[in-house]
Amino acid sequence: MFLDLTRCQINWVHEDTFQYQHQLNTIVLTGNPLIFMAETAFNGPKSLKHLSLIQTGISNLEFIPVYNLEQLESLHLGSNHISSIKFPENFPTQNLKVLDFQNNAIYYILSEDMNALDKATNLSLNFNGNDIKAIEPGAFHSKSFQSLKFGGILNLSVILKGLQNSTAQSLWLGTFEDSDDQDLTPAMFEGLCEMSVESINLQKHHFSNISSTTFRCFTQLKELDLTATHLKALPSGIEGMNALKKLVLNVNNFDQLCQINAASFPSLTDLSIKGNMKTLDFGAGCLEKLENLQKLDLSHNDIEASDCCNLQLKNLPHLQYLNLSYNEPLGLQSQAFKECPLLEHLDLAFTHLHIKAPQSPFQNLRVLQVLNLSHCLLDTSNQHLLAGLVDLRHLNLQGNHFQDRRISKTNLLQPLNSLEVLSLSSCDLLSIDKQAFQSLGKMSHIDLSYNSLTGDSIDALSHLQGIYLNLAVNSIQAIPPLLLHTLSRQNTINLSHNPLDCTCLNMHFITWYKENLQKFEGVEETMCANPPSLMGVKLYDVELSCGITAVGIFFLIVFLFFIAILLIFSVKFLLRWKYEHI
C-alpha cells in the first residue's frame, strides 16, 4: 500500500500516526516542512519498506525516528540541509538498498559515519549535488555497493582516492547541464586503480591532454559512459580494455567514425554514438574489429552515405540491434545488410532512403523482427521492398505516402506473413482495398490514424479478429451496418476525432457503439460533427428518435384521407363517364 502526502503542509508527525495502516509499505512526505517527528511516528505498518523525506528541512539524521524501520529498503533524503551522514545509534540499515542524500550540504565523509552502513548489502548510495571536499581515508574500505553516485563534484581525485579498497558495480561521476564542465587529467584517475568497479559514467566532463595513459586504470571496466565529454577522437594505443562490453560516446565532436579507434575495445557488445555535434563520416570498416558487437546506435548524426551499409558494417556478424534513424540520405543496394544477417531490430526512421535496386535491401534479414521505416520517403510502389522478411513482427511505415493515396490489392505488405504490429499512421491514405491485408493473418495491432479514410476501408479488416485498431483522426462519417460485424470481432478500437454523422442514417452504428462502449478508447474525444445541432456532443450521449412521431402520424393520416377522397372521386368520375358513353 502506497501513501503519498507530498506538499500537504505537514509540520508535526505525532505518535502512532499510522498505527492502523498495517499494510502500508511506502510513505512519501516530500515537500512538507517538518518540525517534529515522534519516536513512534512510524509504528503501525508491518513492513514499511520505502520512506521519502525529500525537501522536508531535515538538517540532522537524529531527527528521523528509528522505531519500526527494520524492514526499510529505501530512504530518500534529498534536497535537505544535511551536513553529516551519521545515523542515530541503532538505526536499522541491514535491509537498506537505496540511500539518497543528493543535493544536501555534505562536505566531508568520515569513517565513523560510514560504519553504520556496514550491515547493508548491495546498497545504492547517492551523493549527487553535494560539494564533497574530502573523504577520510578508509571510509569506504572493504565496503561493497551496487552503485555510487557523486555527480556534480568538481574534484574527482578526492572521490576516487576516498573510494580506495571499495567495490561498486556502478560509479556515477558525471556533471549536469547547469554546472561547469570539469577538466579531467590522467592524474585524477589514479585512485581508480585501487578500487573495483564495473561501470563508470563521466558525462559532461572535459578531458585535458587525453592519451592512452588516461585509461590506464580503466582496464577492469565493463561499461564506460563518456557522453558530452568534448571528445574529438579516442587515442590509439589504449591497452588492456578487453573487459569492456558497453561504450557510450554520445554528443561528442567526432568527424569520422574511425576516430573512436574501435580496435582498442575488442570485446564490445554495445556501442552508442548518437547526437554527434558534427556531421559524422560513416567511413568504411571502422568497426570491423568489433566482431562481437550486438547493439549499435548511430542515430542523430547526420550520417550520409550513397552506398550503405555493407562496407561500413563490415565484419559485424553478431549485430542484433542497429539504429540509423535521424540521419541524412542513405543509398541502399540489394542486400544492403548482408554483413549483419542476425539483425533483429533495425531503425531507419526519419532517414531518407534511396533504394537503388529493384530487389529488397533487407532480403537477407531472415530473423529481423522489428523494422522502423517511418518518414523515410519510401517508394511504396516497389512490391519487392520488404521481400525476404519472413519473421518480421513489427513494421512502422508512418509518414510514407502510397500511390494514388490508396493501398491496392497488390502491395509491398504481401510477403509479411508473420507481421503482428503495423503502423500506417500519417500516410495520407484515402482508401484501402478490401483484400489489401489478406496475407496478414497474424495481426494484433493496426494503427491507421491521421489519414483520410472513410468507413468503407474497415472492410479490409474483415478477416481479422482480436486486434487493436486505431482509426483516430480520419474522415469517417458513417459506418455501414454490414461492417459492424468486422468491428465487433476486434478487442480495442479508437474512432476519436472523426467527423461522425449523428443522424438516423448512422443509427445502427451509434446504437452498436453505445452497446459496446467497453471496446473503445478515446471515447471522450469521439464526438458528432453532423448535424450542426449535435456538433461536439459525445457519441455515447447521443439519443436519436428515428421512428414516426405523433406529428408524423397526423400528417400521414391526413395524407391517406386525401388519397381516399381522391380515389372515391376518381371512381365516381370513371363510372359516370362509362355510363354516358353506353
Question: Residues of each region from the PLM?
Answer:
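Extracellular leucine-rich repeat
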Residues: 1-582
